[in-house]
């Protein structure tokens, strides 16, 4: 059988060859609308349904821990193993992004704008991923920025200062400066889908200092998020509520830069881990008890960071410069 990494672990735990919808959708062998393997797509790669694992929803039972392992670990017999989910789908369950209109922006190593949807509405031209969610009859749209906190950490290494120290010294949000950073350190996905593009600093002069370059990095990721946000409506997705998660969300400057670029408030959860592991635990609870999506609640919100309305025009102008600079940079490859 063809198994994804977590499904190989599942095979060892349960003896069952099973995959779940959200991860399997990324193989391109799944008919995402029908939530089933596609015989046509499998045939295009010389594969057949007989080679594929059984598909389940993330909240369904995929098997039980093998008796041998249960005995070794001191567990009762019959411990349920849920279908589970891919990293971002599980994070969405953890943070309560499970119904149309809800979304989160993750500022981790990569940047992700993830929006839940109650229908399959792809638009390949946008480079927005359209996959099955980890919950039944639910899909998601996802824009991906390959370098978010990764870009900040890269610059922090060059500056020889901790990333938190760099962002903590910035003070209140300012209009984007002339220095411009394109965060394509390893190519880019949404909306360009360009593996060859590479990053760049532009408009540097004698006055450019560490703080200006730090702001440029943060302000370079903000329009990248806006690109994903702007692509969503063509997939039929309208974002009504946005929550920020990930290490980068600890920087108020960065979150407000994104909020101002999107012209949309961003909510910050109270302290706690509401990521993929928490979402996986919720999926396990659903599988073990029959609980429904109602347990995937939104965490307590500590505060909301509003866009700076005095700066939305400046950030819109910076986004236009950012988009134009991509075209110029692409021509140099």
Report the location of each language-model feature.
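Active-site core segments that coordinate phosphate-bearing ligands/cofactors
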Residues: 1-19, 23-24, 28-39, 43-46, ...
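Short linear loop/turn motifs
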Residues: 53-61, 168-171
């Amino acid at each position: 059988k063809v198994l994804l990494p977590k499904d190989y672990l599942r095979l060892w735990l349960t003896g069952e060859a099973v995959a779940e919808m959200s991860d399997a959708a990324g193989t391109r062998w799944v008919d995402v609308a029908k939530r089933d393997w596609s015989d046509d797509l499998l045939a295009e790669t010389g594969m057949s349904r007989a080679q594929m694992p059984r598909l389940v929803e993330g909240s369904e039972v995929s098997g039980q821990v093998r008796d041998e392992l249960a005995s070794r670990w001191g567990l009762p017999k019959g411990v349920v193993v849920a279908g589970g989910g891919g990293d971002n789908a599980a994070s969405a369950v953890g943070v309560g992004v499970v119904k149309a209109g809800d979304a989160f922006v993750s500022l981790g190593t990569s940047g992700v704008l993830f929006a839940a949807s109650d229908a399959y509405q792809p638009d390949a031209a946008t480079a927005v991923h359209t996959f099955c969610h980890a919950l039944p009859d639910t899909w998601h749209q996802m824009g991906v920025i390959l370098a978010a906190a990764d870009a900040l950490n890269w610059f922090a290494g060059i500056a020889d200062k901790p990333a938190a120290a760099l962002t903590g010294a910035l003070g209140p949000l300012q209009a984007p400066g002339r220095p411009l950073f394109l965060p394509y350190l390893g190519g880019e996905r949404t909306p360009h889908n360009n593996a060859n593009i590479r990053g760049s600093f532009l408009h540097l002069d004698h006055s450019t200092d560490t703080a200006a370059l730090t702001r440029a990095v943060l302000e370079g990721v903000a329009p990248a998020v806006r690109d994903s946000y702007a692509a969503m409506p063509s997939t039929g997705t309208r974002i009504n509520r946005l929550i920020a998660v990930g290490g980068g969300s600890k920087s108020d400057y960065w979150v407000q830069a994104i909020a101002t670029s999107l012209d949309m408030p961003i909510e910050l959860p109270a302290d706690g881990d509401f990521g993929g592991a928490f979402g996986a635990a919720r999926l396990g609870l659903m599988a073990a008890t029959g609980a429904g999506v109602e347990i995937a609640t939104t965490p307590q919100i500590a505060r909301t960071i509003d866009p700076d309305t005095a700066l939305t025009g400046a950030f819109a102008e910076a986004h236009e410069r950012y988009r134009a600079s991509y075209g110029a940079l692409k021509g140099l490859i």
